[in-house]
Regions:
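A contiguous, surface-oriented mixed alpha/beta subdomain in the mid-to-C-terminal portion of proteins
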Residues: 1-107, 120-121
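Short, low-order "capping/linker" segments at domain edges
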Residues: 114-124
């Protein structure tokens, strides 16, 4: 199992290095969230790596909220209820419209790990 895990982490790390997130901004130019889209479904495996957290720490802090509505999309934002409530209906629609849906859960990712903390259908 350890050998499999080590190889998976190496693969996930190489995948995250190949993506360029698109930063979605509000009308004042402030970053609201990041959008990652990739044809490589292995991109989803990168969310629990240090490199993933490092990629977003400067813009969103050390506590990230991550939504994975389908196998080719990852949404990342700071742990902010108001920001999530602004976009959760659109994010949930991405899940509903997906050919390959993954999850409607909101995940907290930080140095301690990854946890499902809620659902896009519930209030935060």
């Amino acid at each position: 199992w350890k050998e499999f895990r080590d190889k998976a982490l190496i693969n996930a790390t190489s995948v995250i290095k190949s993506v360029k997130p698109e930063y979605i901004k509000d009308s004042t130019g402030k970053i609201e969230y990041a959008l990652i889209q990739s044809d490589n479904p292995a991109i989803v495996s990168s969310v629990n790596t240090q490199q993933f957290r490092d990629l977003f720490k400067e813009n969103f802090g050390s506590d990230l909220w991550v939504i994975i509505p389908n196998r080719s999309t990852i949404l990342v934002m700071s742990a902010d209820k108001n920001r999530l409530n602004t976009y959760k209906k659109a994010f949930y629609q991405m899940f509903l419209d997906a050919i390959y849906p993954v999850s409607r859960e909101v995940f907290l990712i930080n140095s301690k790990g990854l946890w499902a903390i809620g659902d896009l259908k519930t209030s935060f």
